[in-house]
C-alpha cells in the first residue's frame, strides 16, 4: 500500500520561511481571483507553467482564502508570498479568517478515501467522493485540497491557526514540461 500524503500543521515548518519571496496583497474579491492568480504566476518562468496548471493551483489556494477564510469580505485581505525558479514553485497564502479547523478530520477522510481506492473498494469509495463540513455549500467538496496534496509534491502545510497554507512544487529542470513546438 502506498503512503498517503497528508496536510501538515506546523507554523515553524521551513515552508513558512518567507525570505526572498515576492509579496502581493489582494482584497477578498471573488470575481477577481483568476486575475490575482495571473499576477502571481507571471513571476514564474515559462518552463514551469505547465499549460496553466500552476496558475490553476494558485487560483484554488487564493479562492479558498477569499471564499472560506475571509467569507468574501472585501475589507479583508489575502496575502501571498511566492518564489519561483525553473526547479520549484513555493507559495504561502494567508487570509484573515478563523482558519480551516478541520485539517485533521480532512486528513482522516482523505486517508480513508485513498485506502478504498487502493483496495478497489469502489462501493465504500462512494462515501468519500466529497469532503463536507457543516459550513459547506452545494458546490464545495474538498476537491481543491485533494488536488493540492497531489500537485504540491514538496509539501502542503497549514500554520497553527490554520489560516495560512504553505505549498511547494518540485520541477525536474532537465525535463521542461509544457507544450513543445517542433519546426517539422
Q: Predicted segments — roles?
A:
Residues 22, 87-91, 163:
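Short beta-strand element(s) in the Bergerat
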Residues 77-87:
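Short beta-strand/loop element within the Bergerat-fold HATPase_c
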Residues 145-161:
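Conserved glycine-/histidine-rich ATP-lid loop and adjacent helix of the Bergerat-fold HATPase_c
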Residues 49-79:
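Conserved ATP-binding N-box helix of the HATPase_c
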Residues 90-140:
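Glycine-rich/acidic phosphate-handling loop/turn and adjacent ATP-lid/helix
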Residues 36-60, 133-138:
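Conserved short strand/loop->alpha-helix "switch" segment adjacent to the catalytic nucleotide/phosphoryl-transfer site
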Amino acid at each position: 500500500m502506498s503512503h498517503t500524503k497528508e496536510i501538515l500543521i506546523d507554523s515553524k515548518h521551513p515552508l513558512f520561511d518567507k525570505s526572498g519571496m515576492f509579496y502581493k496583497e489582494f482584497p477578498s474579491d471573488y470575481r477577481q481571483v483568476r486575475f490575482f492568480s495571473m499576477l502571481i504566476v507571471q513571476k514564474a518562468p515559462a518552463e514551469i507553467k505547465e499549460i496553466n496548471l500552476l496558475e490553476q493551483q494558485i487560483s484554488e489556494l487564493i479562492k479558498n482564502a477569499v471564499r472560506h477564510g475571509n467569507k468574501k469580505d472585501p475589507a479583508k485581505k489575502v496575502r501571498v508570498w511566492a518564489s519561483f525558479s525553473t526547479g520549484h514553485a513555493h507559495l504561502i497564502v494567508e487570509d484573515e479568517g478563523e482558519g480551516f479547523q478541520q485539517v485533521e478530520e480532512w486528513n482522516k477522510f482523505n486517508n480513508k478515501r485513498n485506502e478504498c481506492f487502493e483496495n478497489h473498494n469502489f462501493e465504500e469509495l462512494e462515501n468519500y467522493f466529497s469532503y463536507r463540513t457543516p459550513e459547506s455549500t452545494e458546490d464545495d467538496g474538498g476537491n481543491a485540497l485533494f488536488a493540492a496534496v497531489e500537485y504540491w509534491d514538496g509539501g502542503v502545510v497549514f500554520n497553527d491557526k490554520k489560516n495560512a497554507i504553505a505549498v511547494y512544487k518540485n520541477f525536474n529542470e532537465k525535463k521542461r514540461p509544457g507544450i513543445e513546438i517542433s519546426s517539422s
